[in-house]
Amino acid sequence: MLAEPVPDALEQEHPGAVKLEEDEVGEEDPRLAESRPRPEVAHQLFRCFQYQEDMGPRASLGRLRELCNHWLRPALHTKKQILELLVLEQFLSVLPPHVLSRLHGQPLRDGEEVVQLLEGVPRDISHMGPLDFSFSAGKNAPADIISEEQNSPSQVPSHSPQTELPSEEIPALHPLNELPPPQPAPIRPAEPEEWRLAPSSNWPMSPEPQEILQDPRESNPSQGPSWLEENSRDQELAAVLESLTFEDTSEKRAWPANPLGFGSRMPDNEELKVEEPKVTTWPVVIGAESQTEKPEVAGEPLTQTVGQETSSTGWGGTPADGSEVVKVRGASDAPEPQGEMQFICTYCGVNFPEMSHLQAHQLQSHPNLQPHPSSRSFRCLWCGKTFGRSSILKLHMRTHTDERPHACHLCNRRFRQSSHLTKHLLTHSSEPAFRCAECNQGFQRRSSLMQHLLAHAQGKNLTPNPEGKTKVPEMAAVLCSHCGQTFKRRSSLKRHLRNHAKDKDHLSSEDPGSLSSSQESNPYVCSDCGKAFRQSEQLMIHTRRVHTRERPFSCQVCGRCFTQNSQLISHQQIHTGEKPHACPQCSKRFVRRAGLARHLLTHGSLRPYHCAQCGKSFRQMRDLTRHVRCHTGEKPCRCNECGEGFTQNAHLARHQRIHTGEKPHACDICGHRFRNSSNLARHRRSHTGERPYSCPTCGRSFRRNAHLQRHLITHTGSKQEKEVPQECPECGKSFNRSCNLLRHLLVHTGARPYSCALCGRSFSRNSHLLRHLRTHARESLY
């Protein structure tokens, strides 16, 4: 079946077969023969072909047929049925898993039938006889495909009639998920060699013309047995391999060592069990080395135990991650020892002796590239991220569950990773862990030492402080391109850039053209309100806080619930009285670090946020945002009960207590309760007699700041300052307070906004209504 038949014998057996091929091939154009790739180059192109979505299945099949014709030359060496069979098996091996899954359970006979199935075209049952697919799965081969011994280089190969199967008698093709079990094949007597086993791979290769298979050592004795020699043919092959290695698609991790063994890429390959070791004959391969190198000489039989092969490389002899496996030959003619396998990364070309080393290299050097379909990956069920190791996935899951198993025994602070705890413990140690060899300055972290050594390397002046230690100069490593602010660390710059991104996202909501860029920067979108976030944790917190109102973290002391575990931890410091954050200038202590940061701004005069309308400056961006609402009149916070709007959410929460009647703040002396803490503070001054607001001119003190401001008007020197310009538009009467003017306007309008709920009588002032209600109270007593 695989040997080259003698034309006379073939004409006697099948008179029309050879004539059909001759009619189809015809006279070949010499220019086309020169332009087509050489057989070994076409072989590499055929094996390394990858399926592309833009080409489609029909164009991919046509390209494979063209490459296989250049490689196998079916008019000279093989039957058309064998050519179609090789094309079919390679076509199935390059199909992606989601396309290959559509062919499960379908009896495939040729490549055209596969294309019709993928394109949805009804199949023609009488198209052609089925082709044998038993040896193309990479696990077993027909019994007649064996290595044969070459008697003489000049001998014309003969063909045995028993080895050829007519096309109409070839057994039917089994479905992909019902591959037939391998059958042991007897070894036949040696015949003139035309197919043999290549020592460098398990790829089946077709026989080439005699001049191509000539031993390179015979033509040039100085050259070694390597197939990449310094000649024109090898230079052409090396150029093709280099382009395939570094200019291929980003989806390919490495070349498979045995593309025929596509069974390792099947989704249902777990069902293929090996019950007992069976001896099979592997597909033999035509190599590019000398024809005189026979497996029998090296003492290697052509049969191999299935159990041994699958335990090392998987089904079909393919590595687990599909990386390229080659055997490196030296310059000498000595036989290569077994086990010298090299795994090559097709992105950078680095060689590794073991597969685990290659996988670790790809995880570290190429982390952003998508893994090979057959490589192991661990996916997070929360956000969908994939990881190469289960330990990394376990650490990532703690960001969703907020689990912090590592606790500090000194301050009870908890961390997700043990490395973070180790860095934290250095802050409690008085002895520095790292010291500078030049100035003997100590540091708790290696990064601080490296920054200090960088200052030494740049030749900066390190002035000693009074304690004898050198002071590291301030180094601004990164600069914000938007506002010009500098940061020491790149992580701080990334957090700062999010503030600019928020402003861009707000502007992009008004510009529909920039919606796509906003979705790329914020991939996690809330299904309720459409708000987008950069991280899944932010989306989870937003859903709990705004939509579901879920508060899974509760305080065991007071029962108060929180949406985040960090809020619960900071709240528990209120019960313990712990205030770990102290101001270095006034020694005032705070429970939270954010409170200390806000307090530190009060000591400085820096107010970087300015109002564009009135020029007023603020220390924080949120204060400026609240102030701008005074100019625009925007009141985004509205009450669901009465519809009244407020500029701040805190004002809305305080207003809602009027509807609910909640008074959470109680006086510990008289028990009187108040809605706001400020009212409680003013009430306590009535018990203590405290008057914190004093006049700097006369020394008179007041309980409220408003009373002090009213009193200061009496000390102003000019009459214009005494008379506040609040005049009545009806009668021209002036008032020093706006509330008095509003009360006076009720006289002109006749409005009585305060009505009694019992008798319906209305009043212009609230004090009059309260006085009227007392009459009803007296009536109820009698």
Curated annotation (Swiss-Prot):
The modification Phosphoserine is found at residues 160, 206. Residues 1-37, 197-233, 290-321, 491-522 are annotated as: Disordered. InterPro entries: SCAN_dom, SCAN_sf, Znf_C2H2_sf, Znf_C2H2_type. The keyword Ubl conjugation does not apply. Residues 1-71 form the SCAN box domain. A zinc finger (C2H2-type) spans 292-315, 321-343, 349-371, 377-399, 421-443, 467-489, 495-517, 523-545, 551-573, 579-601, 607-629, 635-657, 669-691, 697-719. One of its GO terms (cellular component) is nucleus. Induction: Transcriptionally regulated by POU5F1/OCT4 and SOX2. GO terms for molecular function: DNA-binding transcription factor activity; sequence-specific DNA binding; zinc ion binding. GO terms for biological process: negative regulation of DNA-templated transcription; stem cell differentiation. Embryonic stem (ES) cell-specific. Not expressed in adult, except in testis. Disruption phenotype: Knockout results in high lethality in male and female mice, with most homozygous animals dying before weaning. Knockout 14.5 dpc embryos show facial asymmetry along with inner and outer ear malformations. Residues 302-313 have a biased composition (Polar residues). Methylated at Gln-485 by N6AMT1. Keywords: Activator, DNA-binding, Metal-binding, Methylation, Nucleus, Phosphoprotein, Repeat, Repressor, Transcription, Transcription regulation, Zinc, Zinc-finger. Residues 510-521 have a biased composition (Low complexity). It is found in: Nucleus. Residues 11-20, 28-37, 500-509 have a biased composition (Basic and acidic residues). Pfam families: SCAN, zf-C2H2. The modification N5-methylglutamine is found at residue 485. Embryonic stem (ES) cell-specific transcription factor required to maintain ES cell pluripotency. Can both activate and /or repress expression of target genes, depending on the context. Specifically binds the 5'-[GA]CGCNNGCG[CT]-3' DNA consensus sequence. Regulates expression of POU5F1/OCT4, ZSCAN4 and ALYREF/THOC4. Interacts with POU5F1/OCT4 and SOX2. This is Zinc finger and SCAN domain-containing protein 10. It comes from Mus musculus (Mouse). The gene is Zscan10.
